Design a protein with these regions (language model features):
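Extended, highly charged clamp/arch subdomains and adjacent linkers
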Residues: 1-91, 107-112, 126, 133-143
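Structured alpha-helical segments in the cores of large, soluble enzyme domains
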Residues: 4-10, 37-49, 141-155, 174-185, ...
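Signature of lipid phosphatidyltransferase scaffolds
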Residues: 6-12, 18-22, 235-310, 396-402, ...
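Generic beta-strand/beta-sheet core signal
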Residues: 23, 61-63, 139-141, 165-169, ...
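Active-site cores of enzymes that catalyze phosphoryl transfer or operate on phosphate-rich substrates
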Residues: 82-163, 242-310
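Primarily the HKD phosphodiesterase
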Residues: 157-216, 309-373
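Phosphate/diphosphate-binding loops
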Residues: 197-262, 374-395
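Conserved small/polar residues in nucleotide/adenosyl-binding loops
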Residues: 478-487
């Protein structure tokens, strides 16, 4: 358009051209529309997505050399202050870069492909028998997500399986998990999908998946108006000789095969009855538009997650130097939690924080946070697990779940955490933190002033993510030997 502008305007002289890219607010809220209303949430979301295209501009990028007059005109037309207009010589829209890898020889420019380890202990047709005896931890992307997908297909074909219930937040394109759920519904299983339509920038994808799953016969629920459903929870209910058995999956990341190759996440698969009962209660309450209060095993936000977390921090604080708190999350800004961690440090309790992104708690401040350390791993994969560890030795407790320590997670979302009690699974979670602690190549250590530095005295190179590939490949075969021994 810019190139042919003189032709477009006939006899007029074009003095100046520029490419302007406008970024608009993505903040759409259904709360005001839905409160006290029985409107169809999917239809409401579709209207809101159309409205998003007309929301107020928050930024403009101008590509090329432009005059002050042109800049002023762009700001006036868009209603933007000077600080929100950016002039760049680079292309304003870089999305074309994603198509470039297929056009060039990138030999030597990319990381070597490392396929995820297959858990050889699991054989198709044997999943329920295995899980009846063992908990299983899947560590992504070091191990494949395929066992979970296979479990859904096995549930679909098992005549004793009554239902599959799952929370869905961000699905991959051409999702095999969505296909497995549709297959189960088409083969007579009751499949209930609690699909969060408000997953930012995945709204349209989730609307499309809701229609596909509904057409296959799945029951589609859209969660609660006041709380986003962010928990990663799947429940398979099956008839067993003694009655009903629950097989539950609690995870830290989305049911997304694409991010399973790029994000570090954990999935716990268990037949623990208490976890199953809590999961069943959770799906029942959410189906009625209610949150979950008292539970046996799971920590569930917004009611139970933060109080349980604070109680465990307080218990370690009372132990002073004998206590230990280890936390791995993506981000932290919850003021109450941070204040409690400061108290723990003041009592002499060791507090290790592994926070990949924003952390509003500064470590190493004399008299306040000198027993707190903050470490971030920035490597090939995006660190995404949420892990809590309390105590030392045999009394040590380990938890994994879906929520960060942002106030939106502790107060305004549905999240779920579970204890990891199986000795093998527990050891594997602890090894993740141990590897991050030893990393001296991709680690960044927060300083008291909020800056980050590489570890001092690095010594022999150790990359946690590379090590964990090797570790979890070996773990798969360890599980096989243990399973064969018990048989």
């Amino acid at each position: 358009v810019a190139h042919f502008a003189p032709l477009l305007f006939g006899e007029r002289r074009v003095r100046e051209t520029a490419i302007v890219r406008v970024t608009r607010s993505a903040d759409i809220s259904v709360r005001d529309i839905m409160d006290g209303c029985d409107a169809d949430l999917r239809a409401v979301m579709e209207r809101l997505l159309r409205r998003r295209r007309r929301l107020e501009p928050v930024r403009a990028q101008v590509q090329g050399r432009v005059s002050d007059e042109m800049r002023a005109l762009a700001r006036e037309l868009l209603g933007l202050p000077k600080r929100q207009l950016f002039v760049t010589s680079a292309p304003a829209d870089l999305s074309f870069v994603l198509t470039m890898p297929g056009e060039f020889d990138l030999t030597g420019l990319t990381c070597p492909e490392i396929p995820p380890a297959k858990n050889v202990a699991l054989q198709k047709g044997d999943y329920f028998a295995y899980l009846a005896q063992h908990d299983l931890l899947l560590a992504l992307p070091y191990q494949s997500i395929n066992p979970f997908v296979d479990l859904l297909y096995e549930a679909a074909d098992d005549p004793d399986v009554v239902s599959i219930k799952i929370t869905l937040y961000r699905l991959a394109g051409s999702s095999r998990i969505a296909a497995a759920l549709a297959y189960a519904a088409e083969h007579g299983k009751q499949v209930q999908c609690l699909l969060e339509l408000r997953a930012r920038f995945d709204e349209q994808s989730n609307i499309d998946y809701s229609r596909m799953l509904e057409d296959a016969g799945c029951d589609i629920l859209y969660g609660l108006t006041k709380y986003k459903v962010h928990t990663k929870l799947c429940l398979i209910t099956r008839r067993c000789p003694g009655g009903i058995c629950y097989y539950t999956q609690v995870g830290t990341g989305n049911y997304n095969e694409k991010t399973a190759e790029q994000y570090t996440d954990l999935m716990l698969l268990t037949s623990d009855p208490a976890i199953g009962r809590d999961a069943a209660k959770t799906f029942d309450r959410l189906a009625r538009g209610e949150t979950v209060g008292e539970t046996e095993a799971l920590w569930l936000a917004p009611e139970g997650y933060k109080p349980q977390l604070m109680a465990h921090i307080e218990a370690q604080t009372r132990l002073g130097p004998e206590g230990y708190i280890g936390i791995k999350v993506n981000s932290m800004n919850d003021a109450d939690v941070m204040a409690r961690l400061v108290r723990a440090s003041e009592a002499g309790t060791e507090v290790e924080l592994f926070v990949r992104g924003i952390c509003c708690l500064r470590p190493g401040v004399p008299g306040r946070t000198e027993h707190i350390s903050v470490r971030s791993i920035i490597g090939r994969y995006l660190e995404h697990e949420r892990i809590f560890v309390f105590g030392r030795g045999e009394a040590q407790e380990v938890f994994i779940g879906s929520g960060d320590l942002l106030e939106r997670n502790t107060m305004r979302r549905i999240e779920a955490f579970t204890a990891v009690t199986d000795p093998n699974a527990r050891a594997e979670v602890l090894e993740v933190l141990s590897a991050m602690r030893r990393d001296n190549r991709q680690a960044w250590i927060m300083q008291p002033d909020g800056s980050y530095l590489r570890p001092e005295g690095a010594g022999e190179p150790f990359v946690s993510q590379a090590y964990l590939h090797t570790y979890f490949a070996a773990v798969s075969y360890t599980h096989l030997r243990a399973h064969e021994t018990r048989h």
